[in-house]
């Protein structure tokens, strides 16, 4: 089963897609959702970048950084989930630039008024719309796809309506049973299709690292 999935991933991803923009990931940014789709943390773990096509994009993320306390101790600061929308038309690289976050005062200020910049490959600021994603769910585990869909339907500052319904039934990820020898449960199909989607976005080094990791996993 494991070898079959890895082989399928390679076969599906060999055709070269035309990507125009490299999103450079920051170690202080925990990416949660990209363009309405939950980010595959297992595939992007340790990745330096992912590839985007030209056009509008939306990121949902948290800033996570160790800050210094007044008593010389440290703690991990985790920001509220943030939404940023931007357009990569004619842009070949996107880089995060966060404000200084070193202590409790700066963290509290960021919570109250988040700010950041996205820079292109020439360090020129990219126009962005930034907002806090207010979570409505009281569940212990938050479904960020559902929260982002609700946000995008609410005409908020960083909303992008085109991503509001993309994940309603995952129809954009399910490619049809003709690719499969047998019809597995839909949850299995969806998991594999999500994996294929993020595999295609990952840079070559990350793909190779993931495949090496997958080969070492025990067969189910």
From Swiss-Prot:
One of its GO terms (cellular component) is outer membrane-bounded periplasmic space. InterPro entries: UPF0319 (IPR018635). It comes from the Bacteria. Keywords: Signal. Residues 1-20 form the signal peptide. The keyword Signal applies. Pfam families: DUF2057. Belongs to the UPF0319 family. PANTHER family: UPF0319 PROTEIN YCCT. This is UPF0319 protein YccT. The gene is yccT.
